[in-house]
Amino acid sequence: MLTLFIVLFIVLCGVAEPPAQASELPIIKDSPIPDFQNRPQDVTLYDFDAPPQGLFRAITTSEGFDEELGFHRTHEIVPVKPTNRFRPDTPAIFIVFHLHQHYQGFQVFGRCFPEAVAGLDPTVVIGQDAMHIALEDESGYLTLSPPQDAWKPGRYKVEIHVGEQVNEMSLMGTMRFTIAAASEE
């Protein structure tokens, strides 16, 4: 009786039939590498004429900065009155930034050029600053002072470089700010 029950169970469950064979997959020709890797439509070009990205979590121009105790009990630099429009009598313009995690120290450089300022050559550096970033630093700032006693009205750009020295390979991006004429305030 038991053997009859086992035979019926096997027949009803379909175990007695041979397993169905999977159909063979067709053999296809190898695809060329450009069809699936390094495709032009997948690549977005990095814009060096825009605020830096990648290493920088946030970067802004401001009228000042403050130092606070950060989450990991580190010194965190925060912007005070962030803006990109300043008055001609502004004593200094600050570029405050927050960084992603990094595994060695480096320097952040800022080089200021008069992009659209009457009477100033746009190819001549009118101010620069650098800050050494230690391994434990998560934020920092650059200070730009006016070239004379006051800023001339117009638009300025600041090239942000990262590394040990400024060269064509160290450029990370560009920040811009405007000095408003006294009548525009």
Model-identified regions with their sequence ranges:
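Bacterial N-terminal signal peptides
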Residues: 3-12
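Contiguous segments within soluble domain cores/interaction surfaces
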Residues: 24-153, 159-171, 175-181
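Boundary at the C-terminal end of the N-terminal hydrophobic targeting segment
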Residues: 16, 20-22
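Intrinsic disorder/low-complexity segments
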Residues: 11-16, 64
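Short, solvent-exposed mixed-charge patches
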Residues: 183-185
